[in-house]
Regions:
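The feature marks helicase ATPase cores and/or their adjacent C-terminal helical subdomains
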Residues: 1-577
């Protein structure tokens, strides 16, 4: 009778779960550090199920709950489904959770609003704080005599401000004896600082369980591990990838070694570079020593054709690109990229208020209207308008049909002008202020305008169709992706393109610093930012990984590559003369 082989990843996972259970039983806080493919969510759900089994009835009877705070709505839904929406557990996003708690304390919130960053002038212009209702709707800050509407980012900040007061800490601790925070490394910094300062350091209040991986911090500006005075539990499993890929991850991150489920599983991890290219390379502020965009594209296409011949199924292959200027031309928003050159986060992370409003409100609203999902449309708007007669409905239809037409045929400015007239929906204050500023500058030569006003004027002139395409990209509706858009995802095969075009990531420098370890105050933040994104990218494949570097690499950088991938898996691509 053949012996059943032990699953090393499962053994490591069980040991981590035992330590989580031990911490919960002893009543102390902990941090689960779960690398890529380790099954972080599985550990979190298992801990919740154990709490339900052992304390569920008692919690429900006492009116208390275990809070599970997630980073995304998708994670919230997944976890809630796994625990069958048990009444002893409150699963919600950081914004949903914080708002549900603080909305009970209207007077306290009103007193704190004036202390919020950049809000004092707005409040004073609107006549100050009285007895208005404080609400949180579309996520754009506004004040009038009836209500105060909070911004998206105000919610966790206000929560942190309330937790600074002992009265609210006591109420919070009474309601939530245990709090799990999913993706702790990406959770709002002020909220996490409040949790650390008022609960973890003092060892009072709720049991706090942090679940995440500080090497996968790619959304926030914090890239190093924050100081959490609690026990670390390392989960050294990788249920996703074959040994060939995990060996690269372990070489990159020896302090959290992972073991695989199937030690005999076949796969590959290879690195291709372009040092043999002798033609001119890029030399701009944001792209150094890279292949020209047309050469980079043909290089990628030829490599993919070769990989297909070698057995890759391209239907099961994800291309992760960082050369955003190349990607933009292929996806259909080159003018937006040109406008925000060097500041791509303005559209990729929706930091620009115009892009954010279009991507989060206008585009989803138009999609819902086009599909006749009117309930969804009004949900996006935040309220159902007063439609009391047939004429009201006809006016709505007329304005929406005109908006749909302008999306395809008009410019961004024409869409904004249409919304200024119809107020369906109303434009956020930040956009209205930019409009007023531009009107006040009429007749003034563009060279005399501020750079912000010049950029806004040029943004208005861009065809709105580019907004549709950039929104599709942001929402990952394309065959390509940048590394930011795939955190948490997995694919059979992955081709990672490391190139220039995004000033926050210097791949040749990253590879050099991994070897020399010469970190300074100047390069440290960039190093961690690039390292984390590189780790997230190369840890996505289940079976096959290929990395293509289109920038020239130094001998030091190539030494790092050989140490990570093995010299036998590193290849210099040849270019015809």
């Amino acid at each position: 009778m053949s012996q059943i082989k032990e699953n090393p990843a499962l053994v490591a996972a069980q040991e981590a779960q035992r330590k989580i259970n031990q911490a919960l039983d002893a009543g102390y806080s902990f941090r689960l550090e779960a690398g890529a493919g380790a099954g972080k969510t599985y550990s979190l759900v298992a801990a919740l199920k154990r709490l339900i089994d052992e304390r569920g009835s008692t919690l429900v009877q006492s009116g208390k709950k275990v809070a599970c705070i997630t980073y995304t709505e998708v994670a919230r839904n997944e976890i809630a489904q796994e625990i069958e929406d048990h009444p002893a557990i409150l699963v919600d996003t950081i914004h949903g959770f914080c708002w549900a708690f603080i909305r009970q304390f209207q007077k306290a919130i009103r007193d704190l609003v004036i202390e919020l960053k950049d809000k004092k002038e707005k409040v004073e212009q609107s006549g100050g704080i009285g007895s208005q209702l404080v609400e949180y709707d579309l996520g754009f800050f506004s004040v009038d005599e009836m209500r105060i509407t909070l911004n998206h980012d105000d919610i966790p900040e206000l929560m942190a401000m309330l937790l600074a007061k002992e009265k609210f800490r006591m109420l919070f601790s009474q309601q939530f004896p245990v709090i799990f925070i999913d993706e702790y490394q990406d959770t709002h910094r002020q909220f996490m600082d409040a949790i650390t300062d008022y609960f973890l350091k003092s060892k009072t209040g709720p049991i706090i369980g942090l679940f995440g991986d500080h090497w996968q911090t790619i959304y926030s500006s914090e890239y190093e591990l924050a100081e959490y005075p609690i026990e670390e539990i390392a989960k050294g499993s990788n249920f996703r990838s074959v040994p060939a890929v995990v060996n690269v991850l372990n070489a990159l991150r020896p302090e959290l070694p992972q073991v695989v489920s199937l030690p005999e599983a076949k796969g590959e991890a290879r690195f291709f570079h372009t040092n043999s290219y002798n033609g001119p390379r890029t030399n701009t502020a944001h792209s150094k020593e890279d292949l020209p965009s047309d050469i980079a594209r043909s290089c990628r296409e030829e490599l993919m054709a070769r990989l297909r011949v070698e057995g890759w199924d391209l239907k099961k292959t994800k291309v992760l690109m960082l050369s955003h200027n190349v990607l933009a031309v292929e996806q259909g928003y080159p003018k937006i990229v040109e406008l925000f050159r060097g500041r791509t986060e303005q559209f990729t992370k929706k930091e620009d208020p115009v892009i954010r409003f279009f991507a989060e409100v206008i585009e989803p609203m138009c999609m819902a209207y086009s599909s006749s999902h009117y309930g969804d449309m009004f949900k996006i708007l935040g309220a159902r308008p007063a439609i009391t007669k047939h004429e009201d409905k006809m006016l709505w239809r007329r304005d929406m049909d005109r908006l749909l037409k302008l999306r395809i045929e008009g410019t961004i400015g024409q869409v904004i002008d249409h919304l200024k007239i119809t107020k369906r929906p109303s434009l956020p204050d930040r956009i209205l202020r930019r409009e007023e500023e531009l009107i006040s500058l009429m007749g003034i030569p563009e060279v005399e305008m501020s750079s912000r006003s010049q950029r806004y004027k040029k943004l208005r002139e861009i065809p709105y169709k580019e907004v549709i395409e950039v929104t599709r990209f942001i929402e990952k509706l394309t065959p390509f992706a940048t590394q930011h858009s795939v955190k948490g995802a997995e694919f059979d095969n992955v081709l990672v393109i490391l190139g220039g075009g995004w000033n926050h990531y210097n791949w040749p420098q990253l590879l050099e610093l991994l070897e020399t370890k010469k970190l300074t105050k100047t390069n440290m933040k960039g190093f961690y930012r690039a390292r984390n994104l590189f780790y997230v990218s190369i840890s996505r494949p289940m079976t096959r990984l290929a990395v293509l570097a289109t920038q020239s690499l130094s001998d030091t950088a190539l030494l790092t590559v050989s140490n990570l991938f093995g010299s036998e898996n590193v290849e210099e691509l040849s270019f015809g003369t």
